[in-house]
Amino acid sequence: MRAEIHEDVCRNGFDAELNCFVQAYGSKELDASLLLIASIGFLPANDPRVRATFEAVERNLLVDGLVQRYRTAGSEDGLPPGEGAFLACSFWLVDAYCLIGRVQEAEELFDRLLALRNDVGLLAEEYDPRQKRMLGNFPQAFSHISLVNTAHNLSRKEKPSEQRGR
């Protein structure tokens, strides 16, 4: 069953025209969760589809260097457009950079994310880089869990997906 699902996602979740995985079958939209493809071991980081997907996320979901979850304008989620960047998703980009060998960019983005913490080290769910303020739930455990995981990943010689399946 696992192999069938994997094959189905690779066949139907990858848009050949966009040259990347997409948010949902038949969609042309991206979602930051696509940054997890390699870190969870779904596909290796050196797979051309993974690299192309990471690059597509960078082109389409980065706002002032931080990652939006998805483009709210192209989405039918009932939320108004204009959310901030999701901090957990920005930590996922750090992990993705690590996995594809862009370690300096990973460290720079990680340092930038750390600098967003408040005076007692807390992070919100989102950050608005234009207004330079935290948004959403505060404090947000998901942001902090992502920070801890990413710090751990940056400190190891073996990167996240290399540990999967052991």
Residues covered by each model-derived region:
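Extended glycan-interaction surfaces of carbohydrate-active proteins
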Residues: 3-86, 108-159, 163-166
